[in-house]
C-alpha cells in the first residue's frame, strides 16, 4: 500500500500541495482526479521521490521508497511523461540499458516488450514511434521489476481504441494480482470503467477519497426514467405523490427525481393503481464526468466562458 500523509510541496515561495493525505490500497485501482493545474503530476513526482517534499511523508508498505535502495524497481514502477527517450535508440536497446542499470535480466526486458505488444518493432528507432507506442514502451519500463506498486500518469494518452481497451485490461489485471495501482486520466469515462476508488484533488488540496460507487452516489437524488403509453394521464396522476420532481424530455419520456429512496416502488404502485401501460422504467445515474465537474467546480484554475446568446 502507498500511504501519503500531510504531503506539502513548494516551488520557490509558492505552495502547490497543501497537506495531502490519502492511500492507495493493494489489490485495487485508485483513480487520481483533479482539474488541470490541481497538482496531480506534482503529487506523483513527490510520491516517487523525483521532487523534494516540503513536509509530510510517503511510504510504500510502511517504508519510504529510499529505504528499499536496490529493490526500488521491484517496489515501484511508474509511467510519467514519455519524453525521456534517446530518440536514436531502438526500443530494445532502450529497455535493455535500463534493465542492466537496475540489475534486471535482459530476458525480462524482452519479456516486457512482448507484454506491451512491441516485440515486433523492438529494433525500430524510438524517434519513429507514435505517441501511443511510446506510452507502451514507457509501460514496459515501468513493469521491468515486476513492481508491487504502479503509478501511471495519463497512460491511455495517444492510444487508439484497441490500445485503450488493452491498457484498461492490463491495469485491472495488475490490481487483481495484488498490486496497488494509482492512475490519473482526463478521460473520465475510461476512468469510470477502470478504477475501484477515487482520490480527488483541487488546487493542491484533497477534495475527497471515495469508492467509485460512493462518489457516483454523492449528492445524487434517485432518478427514474419512464415511458408510458399515455404520458399526459400519468403526469396528472403523479400529482398525488409528494416530494417528486418531474421533467418531461423532448423524446416524450418522463424523468422523476426524489429524495425518497423508494421512488421506484412509489412510481410502480402508481402505474399499477392507474392502469398505466409502462413501456420503460429505468433508474438513472449521473456519470463520472458530471460528478467530477460538480465536485471540482470551485477548484478550477480557469474556466471556459460560455458565449452562447451573446
Regions found by a protein language model. Give the residues of each.
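Short, surface-exposed acidic/glycine-rich loop or hinge patches that mediate macromolecular interfaces
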Residues: 65-66, 70, 103, 229-231, ...
Amino acid at each position: 500500500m502507498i500511504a501519503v500523509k500531510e504531503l506539502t510541496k513548494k516551488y520557490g515561495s509558492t505552495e502547490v500541495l497543501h497537506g495531502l493525505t490519502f492511500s492507495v490500497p493493494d489489490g485495487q485501482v485508485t483513480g487520481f482526479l483533479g482539474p488541470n493545474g490541481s497538482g496531480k503530476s506534482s503529487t506523483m513526482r513527490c510520491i516517487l521521490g523525483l521532487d523534494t517534499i516540503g513536509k509530510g511523508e510517503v511510504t510504500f508498505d510502511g517504508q519510504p521508497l529510499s529505504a528499499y535502495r536496490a529493490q526500488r524497481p521491484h517496489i515501484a514502477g511508474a509511467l510519467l511523461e514519455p519524453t525521456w527517450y534517446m530518440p536514436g535508440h531502438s526500443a530494445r536497446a532502450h529497455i535493455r540499458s535500463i534493465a542492466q542499470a537496475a540489475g534486471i535480466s535482459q530476458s525480462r526486458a524482452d519479456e516486457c516488450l512482448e507484454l506491451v505488444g512491441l516485440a515486433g518493432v523492438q529494433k525500430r528507432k524510438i524517434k519513429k514511434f507514435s505517441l501511443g507506442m511510446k506510452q507502451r514502451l514507457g509501460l514496459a519500463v515501468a513493469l521491468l521489476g515486476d513492481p508491487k506498486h504502479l503509478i501511471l500518469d495519463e497512460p491511455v494518452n495517444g492510444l487508439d481504441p484497441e490500445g485503450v481497451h488493452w491498457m484498461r485490461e492490463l491495469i485491472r489485471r495488475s490490481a487483481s494480482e495484488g498490486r496497488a495501482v494509482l492512475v490519473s486520466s482526463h478521460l473520465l469515462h475510461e476512468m469510470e470503467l477502470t478504477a475501484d476508488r477515487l482520490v480527488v484533488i483541487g488546487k493542491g488540496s484533497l477534495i475527497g477519497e471515495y469508492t467509485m460507487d460512493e462518489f457516483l452516489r454523492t449528492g445524487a437524488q434517485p432518478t427514474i426514467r419512464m415511458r408510458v403509453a399515455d404520458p399526459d394521464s400519468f403526469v396528472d396522476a403523479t400529482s398525488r405523490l409528494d416530494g417528486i420532481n418531474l421533467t418531461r424530455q423532448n423524446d416524450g419520456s418522463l424523468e422523476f427525481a426524489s429524495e425518497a429512496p423508494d421512488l421506484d416502488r412509489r412510481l410502480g404502485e402508481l402505474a399499477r393503481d392507474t392502469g398505466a401501460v409502462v413501456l420503460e422504467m429505468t433508474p438513472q445515474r449521473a456519470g463520472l464526468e458530471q460528478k467530477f465537474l460538480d465536485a471540482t467546480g470551485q477548484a478550477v484554475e480557469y474556466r471556459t466562458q460560455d458565449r452562447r446568446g451573446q
